[in-house]
Amino acid sequence: MKFTKYVTLNNRKIIIIGFGSIGPAALLLILRHVDINPNAIEIISDSNKNQDIAENNAIKFLHFKLSPENYENYLSLKLTQNDILINLSVEISSIDLIKLCQKMSVLYLDTSNEAWPSEITGTRTGTYERRQNMQQETNNFSKEVTALVCHGANPGLITHFAKQAVLDVRNSIKNIASVPHTADEWADIAQASDIIALHISERDTQVSTVKRLADEYVNTWSIEGLFEEASENVGFAWGTHEEELPKEMVKNRMDGEKCRIIELNQVAIETQIKSWVPSKGMFTGFLMPHVEAYSIAELFSRKVSNNRYQPTVHFVYHPCLDAIDSMRHAMAQGWVNINHKRLLGDDILEGKDELGILVVRRHTPDIYWFGSRLDIKEARNLIPHNNATSVQVAIGILSGLVWIIENPQCGLVEPEQVDFKRVLEIAEPYLGEFGGYWAKWPEEHFPKITGHALKRHFYNSSKEVT
């Protein structure tokens, strides 16, 4: 089968850091769609897992653990001007890697804003704090070298889904052909469409033929990443339409210049809320802290004098059932001794990953969901030996990679500054059933206002997610 080559790299190297749950799929997509000699790709990983996949594709695999003490010297010997660094690791500082890339005029891409482990730094930083730290470094970064942060599935593709969803809702009200170019223009559309909330809505129903053991931790993507999110206090973008929450629910509230933030006195695994996906309709998921909740909210917010508009933006996630059981077991163990881990892959019998944006509006029960519904069978046809989740993340990586190669002089950027039409053009063939769905929100049963829903859960905290 002949694949489209979106970009050509001559005499340039790609270095990939980390080769766990997503790396193999991302590598295959790069080999398919980037015109590059496999000898110009190197993988650095602190584990020899998946080494055979790299070597079977004639890719150099280096088993090495990067640390704050050695990363600069080690990578400086590997990288030269105009090369590309793709960071798919956990607990390797994104800021430090970007600083090095900027100094060496190397393009940078990652899927998550990572920090060095708390055992090294002495502190654990949360999702919002890591983003703030990154933004504070912006003035220290060169505007001449692109560094695209947080561009996988979510964060990443979900921002482009959000833009398309908001345009679809606007066009359902008043057919306007123009596409916004500035944050104020996007905010105008959202406000004029009476949008009060954007749910990042994901439900994973992939089921393994292998039963989870009592002391085993299972997931369809990074187990460490899932547990880090589940054990963090819930934080998200708090819309201007929301009422105050009772003081006992709130840990922190910030009215920033660009975004209103709220942090709850509960960790994510203890906090549930309703959302909607096409296959199930209404479902209960965990309210997970995710960086795109803040960046998407900023895209659709605006402030003129004392008048401010911002929708609530949060991530409602229903992991696969084995992952839910694993999270609860890990919490009962105090999130320590997470030794026996298993990623679901060829053992998956059935199921899909539905990932999209749910648009909720004031004064109407009509809701609109736009996104990807990728079944495990189609995922395997697209990229063998992968699952639906890894394919969605991997195509986010490829589309981000193509964009930074085509736009090499943009400085530090988040997905909101990326051309969403270009990304969706590249990603769509790998997203399964891709498009929008209209439905009705049954408000008589489930509060549409996030604050009302959270109060209902807080004072009636039965475990609904199953």
Residue ranges and their predicted role:
Residues 56-69:
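Rossmann-fold cofactor-recognition segment
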Residues 22-25:
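Hydrophobic/small residue at the entry helix of a nucleotide-binding pocket
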Residues 35-55:
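NAD(P)-binding Rossmann-fold cofactor-contacting core
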Residues 66-79:
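Conserved Rossmann-fold cofactor-binding substructure of NAD(P)-dependent oxidoreductases
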Residues 95-106, 111-145:
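Rossmann-fold NAD(P)-binding glycine/threonine-rich loop
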Residues 1-11:
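A short, basic/flexible loop-to-alpha-helix module at the beginning of a structural domain
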